[in-house]
Amino acid sequence: MLPSSGDSSKENCAPQDGIVEKEGPNKPFKKKNVKQRNATPQGAGSETSSNAEDKQEEAPILTNAPKDIISMQIQETKAFLSEYEEFVDTDYPKTTFTHVPRKFLSVSPFTPIEADAEGEFLPDADSKCVICHEEKDKTGKSDLITCHGYINGEMDDGKRLLGNIPMFPCRSKFHASCMINYNSGGFHFQYAARLECQARLLCPLHCCNSCNLDHHKQSAYVGDIAECALCLRAFHLTSCYPSGGRDLNVSITIGGKVEKFEMIICPAHYLPGADVQFYNKHKKRKNAVTVVPKADVTMKSHIKACCVIGCEKSSNSKTIMCKTCCRSFHSGCREVETLNGKPIPDDQCESCVCGDPIPQNTLILAKWTDNSFWLALTLDWYKYPTGNRGNINFERLGYTVVQWLIPQENDKEKQPLMSIVPVSDIARLTKNYFSLAKNSTLRNLWEEKYEEQADTALKRCPYVCKTVFGRLRTSVYYKCEPKLEEYHNNEVCNCEGADRCTKLSCQYLADDYECPPSCSKKGVCHNRQVSMGIVSEKIKLAATLCKGYGVFAKGQIEKDEYICEYVGEIIDKAEKKRRLDSVSISRDFQANHYMMELHKGLTVDAARYGNISRYINHSCDPNAASFVTKVFVKKTKEGSLYDTRSYIRAIRTIDDGDEITFSYNMNNEENLPDCECGAENCMGTMGKAKREKPEVADSSEKAAKKNKSSKKKSVKNQNRKSQEAGKNGTASKKSEISPSKPSTSSASSTSFVQQASWPISQNKKNLKKNSNQPVADTGSTLSTSTELNFHEKPQELLSPVSSRSRAASSSTPRAQKSKSRRDDVESEAPPVKRATPSLQTIQETGKAIEFPATKSAITKARALSTQSVPSPHTVEVKVRAISTRGRVQKETKRFEPI
């Protein structure tokens, strides 16, 4: 029962061919000249088919691992969850820690241009905790937990073995108390160990730091992950590679044999201004990332706006300039208060204090040579022109490739301009920076690119399609007692015929009770499906493109036909609150809710254990519904005791191939996800009523002030735009550029790449008038790309998964080694962007239609705003802006119909 993770209004949410049936039991992995294997989600279960769901069987966690190891890991995880049942709130992000160094992995010194190094696991790795680096924790306990993961990035003949290959176990060992309280980068060990999550005890080396910061805590554990060789951080190799990082292949002797692993050095180990001498054939310097800087580096220029997404202060309020990067911030906007138990520095931003990287393919503001800031896009190292890779900063730690995004007239055939800049000179683009654009044209471009990336940014995270940890035939009680009801009727019904006990003439069926077992003595009884654990043969489990797994009809299902029982753990109110609170504490935006209210304070939760019914998705326009019935338990002197169960039944005819859906009808819990079913009557929530805004005591006064201020703001915006339009008709100022204004009509809209393209040859005489505009000069670190044609291959730039492919003709020493796994990665074509309607805040002229802050709702609002309607009205969309650490900022966008 997965909430939609994408735009549910799309037509491509049908089951995918080839993913409908799950494979059978897996055999232990044997390494025999294997170059590639399909990646298996760490912690995801595996099902044979819907026929196997009548067994109470636990799904394997790592399909390639030996079964005895899987069984042992399951028992260890259950024992840990039983011992540490109380969920610990680590007070993140208010209190956090730095990323712990890997003291037990010794890496030999290497130079900035070397791609290989030697490593060795020290003897202390088997006896000390990787967090506190001690044998005993603060309470004096010396018990160590062994990580259930495996070393990432194993290579063979110069190629990375794709997939999670359980060949070499992770060497991390840790105290339970140390790992539970370790929350660097939003890591939450206790939450990841839950049976509905990863169901294993994993250290941070198996969790993508970028996905975790973006609150995608299920995607963080799947896919190809690269470990940092110097600290307990890891990143998805292709989709979340940190800008400013560099690769390092580490050779480690394991079992008497040298094994090579592809790792990275993350940009958190970059020291600005460090005394670094490069490769010399007579003398090799020490590892560049371990050298102490000469002195504190003072940044010469900063972005004069707060870098915190949730900033609510005026743009004119005074900001603090970060001493280690180009960002500025308000002291009250920072969420982090203490780091390693000490107050954070007053003159550093959160990103520098916590070492948060910027993923590649992210919109940024980057500093130009004249200390001005321009819109750019971070790129992979190997998107940089081959002929210019001799640059001294190419693949250097702390530097990244950026492509400048500047509008130009009639430059469709010209190539983009790229630079190599230090990561301390870039900052992720936020709405707070829009006011810094030098003119309206640049501001429009910044806003347009920001909206484009906002719709696709998190799609870079691996798509997760998980199965249930354990399968149940019927529901079971979890730490609560059944609330049985007595039914004073011991007589068997008088139903006859082949379809007996299917009509309301059956006294048990009419009272919503199942027949007692003795009814089967008269013939086949059709009113005992729930007790017998029957699942309709007309349904199948299938993976969708945007909603995880779903349940589809493989034959016509008639109205009122029984489908299956909704199976799970039956929990009470206290346990329900505890489970929902743990999701809120963990800040997991991918958490799925499988709870269905039963009766008298009891709830069925299918998150950990269940059957195929847990995969039935929610819809505000369903074709099935949940019903309550009473099932026979035992006889008494006066009658029989019955228990309450819930089951799914069709409420209209369901054709072959249609997805089966029903309305969850949950109470309006604050921490439940929004509905994304995409139905015309979507209520915006999975609850029983439409989600309304909370009322305040002085709501009328605040509303009046808000309307008044919005009117003034609207008039000011119109005046400002008219003035800028007049200025654009005349000569521009020297500090501004005057490119053509991007079109907003769907007919003439251009792709991301076409608007961002840069000419191969430029008329420098015409550009000298605009002194602040980037120009390619001889001897600078800039170069124009001549071999990469982004107009023919826009997916190389726009794909949420970077290709990271090496050019064979590279002149750098790194290109001389064997080809890596990047040569085999294919880029994906980006989705076609539709024209965005006006986002002006206007006065409401009719009935306002409210939608939740979801992609499907925004898509629907945009569609409505372009339709011809008899009486114009305003379409409101509530949008959530989420900061790096989870602060949620809600705003309302209004689309004026055309």
UniProtKB/Swiss-Prot annotation:
Biased composition (Basic residues): 705-719
GO molecular function: histone H3K36 dimethyltransferase activity; histone H3K36 methyltransferase activity; histone methyltransferase activity; zinc ion binding
EC number, as in UniProt: 2.1.1.357
Domain Post-SET: 671-687
Listed Low complexity bias regions: 737-751, 761-773, 802-811
Zinc finger (PHD-type): 126-214, 303-355
Role: Histone methyltransferase. Dimethylates 'Lys-36' of histone H3, a specific tag for epigenetic transcriptional activation. Plays a central role in early development and is responsible for all H3 'Lys-36' dimethylation until about the 40-cell stage. Indirectly involved in the global inactivation of the X chromosomes in germline cells, possibly by excluding the mes-2-mes-3-mes-6 repressive Polycomb complex from the autosomes. Not related to transcription elongation. Required for small-RNA-induced H3K27 trimethylation. May suppress sensitivity to RNAi.
Protein name from the UniProt record: Histone-lysine N-methyltransferase mes-4
